[in-house]
Regions:
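Terminal, low-structured helical/coil segments at or just beyond the last alpha-helical repeat
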Residues: 134-169
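Canonical positions in the second alpha-helix
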Residues: 27-28, 62-63, 98-99, 134-135
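Hydrophobic face of amphipathic alpha-helices that form TPR/SEL1-like repeat modules
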Residues: 1-10, 37-46, 72-81, 85, ...
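Short helix-capping/linker turns of helical repeat alpha-solenoids
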Residues: 10-12, 31-34, 46-47, 65-68, ...
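A charged, solvent-exposed segment within the mature domains of Sec-exported extracytoplasmic proteins
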Residues: 54, 61-62, 66-77, 90-91, ...
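Structural signature of tandem alpha-helical TPR/SEL1-like repeats
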Residues: 15-27, 48-59, 86-95, 122-131, ...
Length: 169
């Protein structure tokens, strides 16, 4: 059911039909399938179906309870930004931590950022570096960039204050 929904949502090998994909994802989510819930949340968050971030967040919360790393990561992102509900850095960090413990590359990168800045919990540079290294080893480009910035902490900005490059010793 979820697989067909993905094909319909993306138009991969079949005519694109987001409305039918949504129905399939809804049935899967209602049956307790975490992938159905995360895919439905992606559509509800604005990925082609009517945008409903409150519903997306509720669906992700339900899927996150099944220990779905992807749902925990997506819910963490929404919680960190206050999309579909209140912003809560402590709760977001907890969600990222749960997904990172399962090896989710995006969650590992976010844990690195949260640990580096002290957002939602204690600041810990060595933990941040460890999270970034794990995420980078899994191919996360943001983590690779964060590690590079740590090696080259001096920044060049243009006249508008936009990042141009890092300087290294």
């Amino acid at each position: 059911m979820v697989e067909l929904g993905v094909l319909l949502a993306t138009g991969s090998g079949v005519a694109k039909d987001e409305a039918q994909a949504r129905k399939l994802f809804e049935r899967a989510a209602e049956a307790g399938n975490p992938r159905g819930a995360t895919n439905l949340a992606a559509l509800s968050a604005g990925g082609g179906a009517p945008s409903d971030p409150v519903k997306a967040r509720a669906l992700l919360a339900r899927a996150a309870e099944t220990n779905s790393a992807e749902a925990q990561y997506q819910l963490g992102m929404m919680t960190a930004e206050g999309i579909g509900g209140p912003k809560d850095d402590v709760a977001a960090r907890s969600l990222f931590e749960r997904a990172a413990a399962q090896g989710h590359p995006g969650a590992l990168e976010r844990m690195g950022a949260f640990a580096q800045s002290g957002r939602g919990g204690p600041q810990d540079s060595s933990a941040a570096k460890a999270y970034y290294e794990k995420a980078a080893a899994l191919g996360n480009e943001d983590a690779k960039a964060a590690l590079k910035r740590a090696e080259c902490p001096y920044v060049i900005k243009d006249k508008r204050g936009n990042f141009v490059s890092n300087l290294c010793f």
